[in-house]
Amino acid sequence: MREINVSEVEELVRDLCIKANLYLPEDMESCIECNAREEQSPVGKNVFADILDNMRVAREETIPICQDTGMAVIFMTIGQDVHFVGGSLNEAINKGVARGYTEGRLRCSIVSDPLERVNTGDNTPPVVHLKIAEGEKVEIMVAPKGFGSENMSQLKMMTPSVTEDEIVDWVVSVCAKAGSNPCPPIVIGVGIGGDFEKCAYLAKKALCRSVSKRNPKERYAKLEAKMLEKINLLGICLLYTSPSPRDVEES
């Protein structure tokens, strides 16, 4: 049995909240730089130039990449042989988010009640997804989600007889309706299967996969390629599509 003090979790969550809002992952930076070189449109080239400059300024001045620093979404995998000591794990996570957003000078947007609209002042509470695994390891991923893109999310309950082409067409139609609202270039996560909440979770989790990786299952990798091609024909800058079926969600 491995013991971990919850203060370590608090500190790590705090650091990740700041880092995730100031720096893009290396694979995403490389993807943007590659797309910037290959972009043919003069307008597109100017947009990519602004994005690259924004990344540089954020890194050099230690300020957020975007003014919308989002809701903190936390994916946490806990080994079943881990015992947390020193207090409440839930409180530690919330304290970590609060410290990250206040000490990192990040915008606090979360309200205590959706109808009363009273800001909590520290961007808590976060959305936390817990997964129990074997062993003694703990993995924490913080993925701030801004609502410019979150508000463009959609879910459709389809019948078992739905075809792959119908799934692709629906995803393309969602992107077409969203247009420029989610601030292109965009990364698209697609969940397939499960129930209402599971499918939405899969779509959110798919966004955490490296943009340099494709689905390990050939059928879904081909589906990704088909979506990518059709969505790019819309003229909306797209970096990646990532469908995640239920049985390969952790790949």
Listing of model-derived features with the role each one plays in the protein:
Residues P64-V73, T77-I78, V128-G146, R246:
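Short beta-strand elements
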Residues G70, I74-A133:
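A generic, well-ordered mixed alpha/beta core segment in the N-terminal half of proteins
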Residues V142-C208:
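Conserved mixed alpha/beta catalytic, RNA-binding, or beta-rich assembly cores of soluble enzyme
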Residues K198-L234:
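Catalytic or ion-translocation cores adjacent to nucleophile or general acid/base/metal-coordination motifs
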Residues Y240-S251:
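Single conserved hydrophobic/aromatic residue that forms the stacking wall/gate
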